[in-house]
Amino acid sequence: PLVKPPKTNGFLPMSRAEMDARGWRELDVLIITGDAYVDHPSFGASMIGRVLEAMGLRVGIVAQPDWTTIESIQEMGTPRLFVGITAGNLDSMLSNYTAARHKRKDDVYSAGGVPGRRPNHASVVYSQMARRAFPGVPVVLGGMEASMRRVAHYDYWEDKLKPSILSLAKAD
């Protein structure tokens, strides 16, 4: 190949035990994603995680956390630099509902295709969770959902204009 791929240490850690196996006491960056963790460049959280890892940062991923409790994102401790948030490869409302506003029967970005593993408006929910779980740590928002809603926009689901997702999510 023209460019030698960076050496990786296996999958990015998803638990305290996996951090301990690497000899890490803390993360530099924690990425929270609405998708299952798939270590492939077609998944943004994995790709960003690998780029940050190649820069020498210690990166962990929390995939599809339980959004009803902040403990689901606190297992690996407070990250040193920031928390990265993405709803996943697809807008969370499109992942959860059809265009006719019916609940989807499956989710192609969840393990086993099981639906309901991400909340509606996942970027906002995960950002608010990160703010409560890690006070003072910057929250960086990215991904498809955040990109499509970065300015004031019409919300089809609520039939009204909504402000930028950055203000709704209180992201940095």
Question: What do these predicted regions represent?
Answer:
Residues D28-L30:
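Conserved beta-strand elements of the Class I
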Residues R16-M19, G49, I70-S72:
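Short secondary-structure capping/turn segments at boundaries of alpha-helices and beta-strands
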Residues P1-P6, M55-R58, V108-R118:
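Acidic/glycine-enriched edge-of-secondary-structure segments
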Residues A36, G44, A63-D172:
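Glycine-rich beta-alpha loop elements in corrinoid/cobalamin-binding modules
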Residues P1-G23:
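Short N-terminal or domain-adjacent regulatory/targeting segments
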Residues M47-V59:
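Short helix-loop-beta junction
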Residues T33-D39:
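Conserved glycine-rich "GG(E/T)P / GGGxP" loop and the immediately following alpha-helix
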